Amino acid sequence: EDSGTEPSMNFLFDNSHFTDIEAAEGGCYLITNGLGGYSCLDLAGGTSRNDHAIFMAAVKAPNVRYNMITNLLIDMTVDGIIYHLSTQRMADDSFTDNFKYIEKVCFDSNMFSMVFNVRNVRLELCIVMPHGENTLMLNYHISNPECHDVELRLTPLLRFTPKNTAMKADAEFSIREYATDKADAKFPIREYAVAKQLLNSTNNEKMNGGTRDSSDVNCCEEFPANAIIIEGNDLRVVCASNMDVELLSQNSLYSMRWTLDTRDGRDDTGSCVINHCLKKRTSEPDCENVIVYSLCAPEDILSRVQNDIVNAFNKAAADEKARIADIVNHSGLKSELGRQLAAGADAYIVERESTGGKTIIAGYPFFEDWGRDTMIALGGTTLATARYSDCRSILKTFAKYEKNGLLPNLFPEGGMTPMYNSADAPLLFVNAVYE
């Protein structure tokens, strides 16, 4: 089959799907990065599980995962009227029903998009995760044919906790603007603290009607930052954007209820920290606002986005679309179902850092790469899709740790001994080799 043929894997839901909050929470998208990290929210863009996050990073592939950015709240002002576009159930079980503004959502080629329509101003959010790295790229594209006065305001919900772990109430975060050391740097050197320093009594006195000189950066300080560093819980995220950054006067908590966890008997409430927002005001007919979050080195990210961050997003999206198309076409599968299998299976084939080989995640968001499940899944994920080199790598990964005729059913992280508690795994291993 022609390798240039694009697979048909478009899942589209229009506004008729979003009839109530239950429908809004009734499905989710999944974007993966090949490391075990992912982006997963419900179809209306909210969280209905503790393990939902717009940016879940795998700090050690594939199982040491951290909920970095749970979500970004979306507010759009049109001619002075504020429209809250995010849909989320709150800790007191109240909820925002802003799914009514959704025109459509679409999942295609490991990317997700959703379109809001407010008074003929369309806001399209597109999400992509470049393969093989802990990076999330977001494009908030404003189409404004009638040239309304529009302000887009995005509020990140910071978590920085291990997956499925509650954030501590006293969690501290800091923000500083990234600075290059080049003489012609576009990123001036400035430091901003928004943790204890921001909340001390002296600063509070200044914010509550006292005098305030130009050196204070505590009360809704704005700066045209092209890149900031967000730090918390001994982790650091680079945020690059063509939007302006506004620091809030103090950290605040945003509390949520996760109804799918209520159903399953898990802890169903939790909080995130809010300490800044990103915003853009425009009356242009077309405006693209890109945000990049990454655990990569700041200089690596900025080398890609510094000159044209919109083009960097478009390239990442095109690269991911081409990667999925190559996987599907290489599989040789002709039916729509078979091609869907080839595309979908890619989400579960990930790197294992400890062995330097491939492995298979048993499922998102809960499961890890278990030996028995991996051997069961080999046929459908690798053999049926002609991913023979990946199959070979996975078999070698597990064979390396053979012990007394058994294969590891679990690779505990942190140098611990693998668990050998599955008699099925070696039998399924032999079957996979035979096939």
Give a label for each model feature.
Residues 1-435:
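Acidic, mature catalytic/reactive cores of soluble proteins
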